[in-house]
């Protein structure tokens, strides 16, 4: 299996004087599901943001698809805690926004979308059980429904690596379990790598591997694999 994420002697945080976490060695392969747990403020979101290339490491090596530069357009999908949806637009518009990551700029400007893009958008909306809300403005949806829109948007993007920060929050337990199963089957069927930050320990342990960020003696977080 080819490595999608490789981190060696990685230090992350906001400045050299405020290192949040130190990661000696982390390798994540294609098609693998990895979960990250840990107390609030310990560096879970910061780690995801570094992998997404939204934040630079303080030190060490972090390779995504074997490169330290920014991944290709649309190759990495990120579901943040703050969803970033266009709330006055429809569910369809928001999911389409993810799908056009792989289209040309010219096509996107003029709205000339290939049928396969339209099909992907509708498939993603259907998987998240939102077909009946497809033409509804996002602002009229519940918090849980909006979260499902964000997940559908990332699925439609066709990313090879999906990073999800508490992506099941605001969902009731039954819906969260359903969405987890759909996402699990989707990434496994398409050999997509999924890295999730998850507060529910039992659900986190359903991943192929589970890691915990925990405080060391010098108050810098370290990443430890959790036995399942």
Regions found by a protein language model. Give the residues of each.
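A short, flexible loop at the N-terminus of ABC-type nucleotide-binding domains that lies
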Residues: 1-7, 11-24
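Conserved ABC ATPase "signature" region
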Residues: 108-133
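Catalytic Walker B motif of ABC-type/P-loop ATPase nucleotide-binding domains
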Residues: 162-166
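Conserved ABC transporter NBD signature motif
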Residues: 60-74
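Conserved ABC ATPase signature
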Residues: 137-141, 145
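Hydrophobic anchor residue at the start of the ABC signature
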Residues: 97, 151
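Helix-to-loop junction immediately C-terminal to a conserved catalytic motif
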Residues: 52
């Amino acid at each position: 299996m080819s490595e999608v994420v490789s981190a060696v002697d990685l230090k992350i945080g906001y400045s050299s004087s405020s290192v949040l976490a130190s990661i000696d060695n982390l390798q994540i392969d294609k098609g693998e599901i990895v979960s990250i747990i840990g107390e609030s403020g310990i560096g879970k979101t910061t780690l995801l943001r570094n992998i997404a290339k939204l934040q630079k490491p303080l030190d060490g090596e972090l390779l995504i698809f074997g490169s330290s530069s920014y991944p290709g357009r649309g190759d990495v999908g990120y579901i943040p805690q703050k969803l970033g949806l266009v709330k006055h637009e429809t569910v369809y518009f928001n999911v389409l926004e993810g799908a056009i990551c792989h289209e040309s700029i010219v096509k996107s400007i003029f709205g000339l979308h290939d049928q396969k893009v339209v099909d992907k958008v509708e498939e993603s909306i259907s998987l998240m059980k939102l077909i009946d809300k497809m033409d509804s403005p996002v602002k009229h949806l519940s918090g849980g429904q909006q979260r499902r829109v964000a997940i559908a948007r990332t699925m439609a993007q066709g990313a090879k690596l999906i990073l999800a920060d508490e992506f099941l929050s605001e969902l009731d337990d039954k819906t969260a379990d359903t969405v987890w199963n759909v996402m699990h089957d989707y990434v496994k069927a398409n050999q997509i790598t999924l890295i999730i930050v998850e507060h529910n320990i039992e659900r986190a342990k359903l991943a192929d591997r589970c890691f915990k960020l925990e405080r060391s003696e010098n108050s810098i977080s370290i990443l430890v694999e959790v036995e399942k």
